[in-house]
Amino acid sequence: MAKQKKFSGKGSARSKRKQNRKQVGPRRRVEFKYKGFTLGELQEMPIKKFMEIVPARQRRSMKKGITPKQRKLVMKIKKARRLANRGKDPRTIRTHCRDFVITPEMIGLPFGIYNGKEFIEVKLVEEAIGRFLGEFAPSRKVVQHGSPGMGATRGSMFVPIK
């Protein structure tokens, strides 16, 4: 019978952390906070105060004011929010405004964001606050090049085709 190594108590830090971790009951979800504010506080907050806590790029964009297209989007958001408060399921809000900053009142609403070809369906969650709509609908496709065809390289010019 082969000798077994005695456990000397020395193990990797990872195994020690695993042993110390005790899971009792189901994991509870930590309440969402954005820069120290809960979602409820953010929704009650005036837009001027919200502008102070978002990053500089978004703040500069909001400071410029809203364009007529963005104003139309705000009206659609308010209409959808009223429907959602009544208990009805709001329809997807389709928009071309990719440069619109996501505010707390938009959370939970379905959006169709145009990527230049089609509308990408997105349901906004709390983690999206303070980002631009365009970040959730990539406008460029990642190119995946295939293998080169016959005659694409000089070495393959004189290879007989099967």
From Swiss-Prot:
Biased composition, class Basic residues, residue ranges: 1-27
Gene (UniProt): rps19
Similarity section: Belongs to the universal ribosomal protein uS19 family.
Annotated keywords: Ribonucleoprotein, Ribosomal protein, RNA-binding, rRNA-binding
Disulfide partners: none
Protein name per its UniProtKB record: Small ribosomal subunit protein uS19
One protein family per Pfam: Ribosomal_S19
Described function: Protein S19 forms a complex with S13 that binds strongly to the 16S ribosomal RNA.
Membrane spanning stretches: none
Ranges for region Disordered: 1-29
Cellular component, GO, one term: cytosolic small ribosomal subunit
GO MF annotation list: rRNA binding; structural constituent of ribosome
Gene Ontology BP term (one): translation
